[in-house]
C-alpha cells in the first residue's frame, strides 16, 4: 500500500531540489496549485500521466516517487520486519542498562533533548549544516538519548537521509517512536548494532556522523574507527567529535591524582589522531570546538575527578576525516 504522506513529502522534496514553487510546478504540469498542494499534503496522488511527467522532470522512476526505499536492506541485507528497526543485538535491553533505559523513557529524555536542539547552538548548528550539506546516506553512530548530531542535521535539512544507530535497542526504539510522531519522514531509518562491528556492507555509506560515540564506546575505539573507514564509500567522510584531557592539563595535576587517573581512566587522555590515521584516513582536519570541566558534569569521570579533588579540563574537537 502506498503511504500518501510519505509520497507527499518525497514529492515536495524533489520539487524543492528542482528549485520550483508549487505554482511553477502546477503551471508546468497544467494543473492547479491546489492540486500540487493536495499531493504534497498526502491527500491525493496524481494520475499515471502526471506521475510519468513528474518522473521525467525529476529524473527518477515512478517507483522512486511512490514507494518507500528499504535502505537498511540495501546496506545490511537484513529486513526490518514490522518494527521497521533492524536489530543486530537482542531487542531486550542489556541487564546492566535497564535502569538507565527506564530513566530515558520515564524522564522523557528524547523529547526534552529534541526540544533543546531547536534552540540556537552555534557549534552544533554549524556541524549539522556541514554534515547536511553532504549528499547521500548519513549514518549517525552512538545516537544516544541526546541524538548526537542528528537533530542539528535535520534542523539544517529536514529531507536528509539518516540511519540512526545505537548499541541500546531502547535508544533506537524511543527515537523512532518520537520522530515518527514528530516528523514522519520517509528518509529516516533505525538500527541497533555495535559500531565496533558494523553489519554494513563495505563502501555503502556517504557520511558517518559521530558526536562522542566513538570517544565513549564500550569496545575498542581503534576498531570503531577501522569499521567507519570500511563502510564509507571512497570520498566519504567521518565527522567526529569528542573531548580529551591534554598532556599539559595532566602534568599540572597532583602526582597522586595523575597516577590514579592514568590507571583507572587512561582513555580520557587519548585524542585518537594516531588511531584515525592507522584506520586508513589520510586527510584529517581537526578544529577545537570548546572546553568543558568535570565540575560542571555528571559522569563517571566527573565523579572520579571530584573524589580526587581535581577539576579536569577537557578539550573538545570536531574532526573531519575523508576516505580517499
Task: Enumerate the language-model features and the residues they cover.
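Conserved class I S-adenosyl-L-methionine
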Residues: 74-135, 152, 171, 239-263
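Class I SAM-dependent methyltransferase SAM/SAH-binding core
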Residues: 139, 144-197
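A short SAM/SAH-binding and catalytic strip from SAM-dependent methyltransferases
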Residues: 206-220
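A short glycine-rich, Lys/Arg-flanked "PGG" loop and its adjoining helix->strand segment in the class I
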Residues: 222-234
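A short acidic, Gly/Pro-enriched loop at the edge of an enzyme's catalytic core
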Residues: 196-208
Amino acid at each position: 500500500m502506498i503511504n500518501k504522506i510519505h509520497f507527499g513529502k518525497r514529492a515536495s522534496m524533489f520539487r524543492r531540489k528542482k528549485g520550483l514553487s508549487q505554482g511553477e510546478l502546477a503551471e508546468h504540469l497544467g494543473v492547479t496549485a491546489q492540486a500540487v498542494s493536495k499531493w504534497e499534503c498526502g491527500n491525493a496522488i496524481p494520475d499515471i500521466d502526471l506521475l510519468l511527467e513528474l518522473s521525467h522532470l525529476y529524473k527518477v522512476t515512478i517507483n522512486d516517487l511512490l514507494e518507500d526505499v528499504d535502505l537498511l536492506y540495501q546496506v545490511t541485507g537484513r529486513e526490518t520486519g514490522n518494527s521497521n528497526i533492524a536489530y543486530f543485538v537482542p531487542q531486550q535491553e542489556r541487564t546492566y542498562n535497564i535502569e538507565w533505559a527506564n530513566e530515558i523513557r520515564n524522564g522523557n529524555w528524547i523529547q526534552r533533548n529534541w526540544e533543546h536542539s531547536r534552540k540556537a547552538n552555534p557549534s552544533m548548528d554549524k556541524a549539522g549544516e556541514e554534515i547536511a550539506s553532504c549528499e547521500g546516506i548519513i549514518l549517525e553512530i552512538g545516537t544516544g538519548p541526546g541524538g548526537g548530531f542528528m537533530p542539528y542535521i535535520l534542523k539544517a535539512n529536514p529531507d536528509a537521509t539518516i540511519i540512526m544507530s545505537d548499541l541500546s535497542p531502547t535508544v533506537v526504539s524511543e527515537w523512532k517512536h518520537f520522530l515518527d510522531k514528530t516528523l514522519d519522514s520517509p528518509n529516516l531509518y533505525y538500527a541497533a548494532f555495535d559500531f565496533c562491528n558494523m553489519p554494513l556492507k563495505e563502501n555503502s555509506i556517504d557520511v558517518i556522523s559521530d558526536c562522542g560515540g566513538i570517544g565513549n564506546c564500550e569496545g575498542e575505539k581503534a576498531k570503531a574507527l577501522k569499521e567507519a573507514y570500511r563502510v564509507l564509500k571512497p570520498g566519504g567522510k567521518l565527522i567526529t567529535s569528542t573531548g580529551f584531557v591534554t598532556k599539559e592539563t595532566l602534568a599540572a595535576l597532583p602526582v597522586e591524582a595523575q597516577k590514579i587517573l592514568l590507571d583507572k581512566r587512561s582513555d580520557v587522555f587519548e585524542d585518537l589522531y594516531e588511531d584515525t590515521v592507522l584506520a586508513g584516513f589520510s586527510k584529517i582536519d581537526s578544529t577545537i570546538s570548546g572546553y568543558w570541566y568535570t565540575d560542571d558534569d555528571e559522569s563517571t569521570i566527573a565523579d572520579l575527578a571530584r573524589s580526587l579533588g581535581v577539576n579536569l579540563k577537557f578539550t573538545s574537537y570536531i574532526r573531519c576525516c575523508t576516505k580517499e
